[in-house]
């Protein structure tokens, strides 16, 4: 059963260092950890790394609001993140930060190689500048009066009243969102990565058959829309790395973020005193395998920019991207008001890590499907599978072995053919773990657990124990049950690390994939102790209530949003009543050719279709992720003819702009076409 050992480097997407880890994050880290633990069990050389994504304007501004330095903020956040991941037994070999010497050196190296190879272009662009803060202002850090319809308090890229798009320089009486000052125009030289030069290479990589079908199909849509040059620079002040020989210019966060994978691995190699592995893993002709586990919202960056950057700087490309969907709770988006926006640390105060690891694993597949954490089903499944089927198998047999036979198992198997059925399943279960068909693996294992429990039911050791002269039969039956339990727990070891440690202590033997062919015969086990406790809905209720209380505590008066976006002048009810807000279903979402800001949305109002252009592309780089969501739109705006077509309304969104735009969604039960009052 031993395989040829492979060298594998596995990463998870880097959590942004301005917020806590929640159950949505944990899906990816659990998925990757289960896969990594399986690879290690099969004897492969696996390096599992991650880091905090620690750069960008949001980090800089939040640190200012907190009255601390960005370095202090990201340092505290890193400790919190690492504590959360350790609590869930995520077995990282290294957890680093993009704000590191290794990442700076590698970012500069890759940039220099791209520049030397002709893939960096310089272009002067005009931007608004905040004279008080001394900073250039992104489009959504400027507000003013719309030059088209004269509506006040509109962003610098498009009007949310009439739907017009424009440049920030066209705003009437523009104001800086950061300081309230009147901005001035300044030219600035920016640096662009020539992504279109890599179109053929990327298309060949897409057609290689390695990528998930859904990812390959989405990439094909992007190719058909045409790849654009990518602005990789930002002007000071900016928290990040300064571009070599370009004072006051900084690498955009999405340039150095994926390089953080390399930086974390370099840091690990340096800690080990390993001077060869970094080159072996990252050189262009490396025979090591490189896998990125990511969410579907960042496919654009990882499938286009990242492999192109690596190709242009003579490093190897990823072997594959393993993309997953989002997490919903009880069939809906995680909600702070309902207490279902649950932080990782809050979960661990009410449940153990293995319970969530098992539930997520049972629902995961290799497809990019959303996973629903139904809290009632969670309780039922954990109790039914882990407690009733698996742990109960051990408890039903261990007592007899401990009390009647001093913990010593029988010298022979009671049913060798049944045992072979269990060990033969290693092929199917192993293939399921390998291909990330986790749900299939769990189904196969639980089917075996049912067989094992039926065996015990039929043999009835509690009856045999009362019959004189049948001690050998009793020992054989219970030893068989414990050996079947051992095989099941070996298959489950990648999923349930804490339970596995307890089981290994009881069995007095390590759970090793390649050792299951040899049962434990004449082997002494330790005294059986309770391995896992049942859970109940009272714990769920306490968890939800605790999450609500955390939201209330965090909702104490703050100055940030209200200071940045003061409440506007009072309007009459009659003024408000003129605005017809409706629930709309997003039937389709796509890029707008010729615009780097707009998405074209096809909205269903419950029988009537609308075409709407919305300036939300910066926050939703994968429009496909919006399809099927409900949102709120202004339905009675006069249609406006734009360069790209006619816009028939406006969708509602919150946030300061850039990556921080959040499309509004109605609560559960709302239907397309219903009026929002």
Swiss-Prot record:
HAMAP family, alphabetized: Met_tRNA_synth_type1
Organism: Salmonella schwarzengrund (strain CVM19633)
Binding site for ATP: 336
Taxonomy of the source species: Bacteria, Pseudomonadati, Pseudomonadota, Gammaproteobacteria, Enterobacterales
Aminoacyl-tRNA synthetase as UniProt keyword: yes
CDD domains according to UniProt: Anticodon_Ia_Met, MetRS_core, tRNA_bind_EcMetRS_like
Intervals of motif 'HIGH' region: 15-25
Cofactor requirement: Zn(2+)
Sequence positions that bind Zn(2+): 146, 149, 159, 162
Assembly and binders: Homodimer.
Compartment(s) where it occurs, according to its Swiss-Prot or TrEMBL record: Cytoplasm
Designated name of the protein: Methionine--tRNA ligase
Cofactor note: Binds 1 zinc ion per subunit.
Molecular function as annotated in GO: ATP binding; metal ion binding; methionine-tRNA ligase activity; tRNA binding
GO biological process: methionyl-tRNA aminoacylation
Family listed: Belongs to the class-I aminoacyl-tRNA synthetase family. MetG type 1 subfamily.
EC number: 6.1.1.10
């Amino acid at each position: 059963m031993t395989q040829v050992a492979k060298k594998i480097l596995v990463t998870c997407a880097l959590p942004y260092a301005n917020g806590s880890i929640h159950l949505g994050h944990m899906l990816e880290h659990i998925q990757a950890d289960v896969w990594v633990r399986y690879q290690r069990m099969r004897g492969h050389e696996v390096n599992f790394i991650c880091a905090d994504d620690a750069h960008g304007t949001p980090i800089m501004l939040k640190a200012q609001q907190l009255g601390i330095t960005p370095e202090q903020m990201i340092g505290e956040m890193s400790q919190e993140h690492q504590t959360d991941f350790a609590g869930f037994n995520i077995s990282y070999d290294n957890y680093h930060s993009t704000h590191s010497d290794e990442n700076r050196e590698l970012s500069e190296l890759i940039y220099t190689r791209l520049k030397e190879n002709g893939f960096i272009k310089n272009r002067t662009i005009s931007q608004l500048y905040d004279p008080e803060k001394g900073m250039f202002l992104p489009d959504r850090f400027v507000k003013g009066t719309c030059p088209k319809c004269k509506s006040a308090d509109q962003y610098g890229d498009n009007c949310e009243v009439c739907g017009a798009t424009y440049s920030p320089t066209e705003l009437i009486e523009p104001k800086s969102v950061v300081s309230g000052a009147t901005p001035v125009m300044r030219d600035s030289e920016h640096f662009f990565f020539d992504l279109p030069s890599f179109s053929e290479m990327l298309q060949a990589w897409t057609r290689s058959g390695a990528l998930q079908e859904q990812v390959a199909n989405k990439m094909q849509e992007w190719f058909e829309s045409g790849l654009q040059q990518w602005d990789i620079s930002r002007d000071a002040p900016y928290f990040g790395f300064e571009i070599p020989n370009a004072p006051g210019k900084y690498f955009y966060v999405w340039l150095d973020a994926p390089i953080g994978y390399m930086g974390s691995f370099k840091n690990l190699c340096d800690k080990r005193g390993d001077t060869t592995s970094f080159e072996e893993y990252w050189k262009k002709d490396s025979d090591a395998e490189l896998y990125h586990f990511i969410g579907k919202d960042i496919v654009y960056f990882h499938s286009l920019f990242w492999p192109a950057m690596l190709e242009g700087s003579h490093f190897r490309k990823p072997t594959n991207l393993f993309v997953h969907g989002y997490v919903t709770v009880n069939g809906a988006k995680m909600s702070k008001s309902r207490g279902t926006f649950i932080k990782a640390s809050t979960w661990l105060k009410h449940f153990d890590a293995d319970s969530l690891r098992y539930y997520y694993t049972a629902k995961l597949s290799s497809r990019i499907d959303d996973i629903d954490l139904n809290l009632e089903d969670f309780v039922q499944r954990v109790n039914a599978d882990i407690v009733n089927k698996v742990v109960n198998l051990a408890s039903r047999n261990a007592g007899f072995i401990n009390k009647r036979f001093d913990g010593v198992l029988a010298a022979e198997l009671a049913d060798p053919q049944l045992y072979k059925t269990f060990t033969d399943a290693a092929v199917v279960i192993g293939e399921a773990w390998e291909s990330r068909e986790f749900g299939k693996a769990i189904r196969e294992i639980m089917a075996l657990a049912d067989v094992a429990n039926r065996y015990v039911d039929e043999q009835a050791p509690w009856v045999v124990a009362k019959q004189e002269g049948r001690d050998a039969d009793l020992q054989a039956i219970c030893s068989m049950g414990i050996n079947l339990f051992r095989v099941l727990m070996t298959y489950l070891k990648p999923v349930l690390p804490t339970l596995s440690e307890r089981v290994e202590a009881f069995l007095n033997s390590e759970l090793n994939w390649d050792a299951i062919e040899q049962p434990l015969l004449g082997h002494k086990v330790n005294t059986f102790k309770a391995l896992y406790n049942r859970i109940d809905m009272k714990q769920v209720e306490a968890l939800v209530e605790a999450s609500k209380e955390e939201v209330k505590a965090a909702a104490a008066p703050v100055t940030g949003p209200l200071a940045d976006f003061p409440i506007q002048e009072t309007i009459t009810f009659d003024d408000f009543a003129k605005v017809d807000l409706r629930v709309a279903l997003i039937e389709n979402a796509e890029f707008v050719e010729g615009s780097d800001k707009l998405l074209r949305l096809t909205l269903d109002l419950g029988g009537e279709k609308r075409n709407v252009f919305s300036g939300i592309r910066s926050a939703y780089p994968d429009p496909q992720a919006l399809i099927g969501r409900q949102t709120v739109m202004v339905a009675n705006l006069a249609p406006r003819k734009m360069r790209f077509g006619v816009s028939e309304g406006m969708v509602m969104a919150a946030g300061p702009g850039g990556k921080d735009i959040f499309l509004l969604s109605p609560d559960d039960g709302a239907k397309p076409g219903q009026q929002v009052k």
